[in-house]
A protein has these predicted regions:
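Aromatic (phenylalanine/tyrosine) cluster motif
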Residues: 3-4, 16
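A residue-level marker of the well-folded mature domains of exported/periplasmic proteins
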Residues: 5, 28-394
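Hydrophobic helical h-region of N-terminal Sec-dependent signal peptides
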Residues: 9-17
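C-terminal segment of classical bacterial N-terminal signal peptides
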Residues: 16-26
Length: 394
């Protein structure tokens, strides 16, 4: 599906203004905010793009000036952070991603008077560093339950999850998805009287950038009968969706099932609005924006800030989220109002085809998570991922 990939690249260039070099934005001497991205980079349709979205919203709403610094390899993290700090030009320097943790710890010590922020890190404990973490396990439990129940409804007995590099933060996604699958199986049996026995296929691809590996992993899962594929690898989701699209085309279909489950951003608008059933929205944009806002209003405080379902940091995608991201595409000039209508109509039909009780059940689990009645395993917390795999098996 070369056309699909080229189309996605064109969308990203128009919306996000992809950069070829390491720096973009205002002239360095005039900037106040530096955003240092990980190797996944812009154009991933999820994690890094959401980080940039939050910074761009701060530009629009708070009047800050932004320099975006791309990391082309892991070797770039330390010098990128050091160069930004050494310039003395920035009120805050934000690292987007777990992979920057070691470099951020070193640079925070080297420049004690510089304010820093980092996403997906909560253990560094530096007096000049705001650490922003997310309850990905809770959001993944919601889409895990949805995946199991929807798969069973459509006659599938497997769901899949395609992950990136095997790191602790991704264990949180896996742990929650496993819990959700088991919860969804139990709820389906309770409502229908039939035990669906939906099982899990999972693959740590070892990359956040090789789209072909995402596609290959998804193809293998589809061949084994998976009805849902959860993307937990940023841009590899482009490959996941390519595989699903080609699988459907081979059957003379354009709409799922099988479906993809999106991650981080709202990815429901991809696949013409009828091949991504839902997205586990991890609001990296909210985290980046809140860090910048704290500097603007003078409330910056070092330490750990956790974002989850209770404070807007984690959510399963809803219709308004779809509308917001369609607006974003229209603003970038890559879709039109006519596209809005077809994407929204396809999405509405896709969602309506899933029985209402399944969506109600997802809402029930969400309420139980919020109240604390449902305790979702974490993965990198005291309960290890090995124990969780035993407790909530494939």
């Amino acid at each position: 599906m070369k056309y699909f990939r080229i189309k996605m690249a064109a969308i990203l260039i128009a919306i996000f203004g992809l950069v070829a070099g390491p720096l973009s934005g205002a002239a360095l001497a005039a900037t106040k905010v530096a955003l240092v991205l990980d190797v996944g980079g812009r154009g991933d349709l999820s994690f890094n793009d959401m980080g940039f979205k939050g910074a761009d919203e701060a530009v629009q709403k708070l009047g800050v000036e932004l320099v975006e610094i791309q990391s082309n390899s892991a070797a770039d993290y330390l010098p990128n952070l050091q160069n930004a700090a050494r310039s003395g030009a920035f009120d805050i320097i934000i690292g987007v991603g777990f992979l920057l943790a070691d470099s951020m710890a070193e640079v925070a010590d080297q420049f004690p008077d510089q304010k820093f922020g980092i996403i997906d890190v909560t253990w560094l404990g530096k007096p000049n560093l705001m650490e922003i973490g997310y309850e990905e396990n809770k959001g993944s439990a919601l889409v895990g339950a949805l995946s199991a129940m929807a798969a069973a409804h459509y006659g599938y007995d497997k769901i899949g999850v395609v992950l990136g590099i095997e790191i602790p933060v991704l264990y949180k996604f896996e742990a929650g998805y496993r819990y959700g699958m088991h919860w969804g199986n139990a709820k389906y049996a309770e409502v229908t009287g039939s035990n669906p026995g939906v099982g899990l296929l999972w693959n740590y691809t070892g990359t956040f950038s090789d789209i072909a590996k995402g596609k290959a992993a998804t193809e293998a899962m589809l061949a084994q009968g998976a009805g849902m594929i959860y993307n937990v690898a940023g841009p590899l989701g482009i490959g996941d969706l390519e595989a699903i699209t080609e699988h459907l085309e081979a059957k003379g279909k354009s709409a799922g099932p099988p479906f993809m489950i999106g991650v981080d951003a709202n990815q429901d608008y991809l696949g013409d609005g009828h091949r991504v059933l839902a997205s586990m929205m991890k609001r990296v944009d909210f985290g980046v924006y809140s860090a910048i806002e704290s500097v603007v209003n003078g409330s910056f405080k070092a330490g750990v800030k956790i974002l989850g379902p209770g404070n807007g940091g984690i959510a399963i995608s809803r219709r308004q989220d779809l509308a917001d991201f369609i607006d974003f595409g229209i603003k970038g000039g890559v879709i039109t109002e006519a596209d809005r209508g077809s994407i929204t109509a396809n999405w509405d039909a896709m969602r309506a085809a899933v029985p209402g009780w399944i969506w109600d059940a997802v809402g029930e689990l969400e309420a139980k998570i919020s109240s604390g009645e449902a305790e979702i395993p974490c993965g990198w917390c005291p309960d290890t991922i090995g124990d969780i795999r035993n407790q909530y098996p494939d």
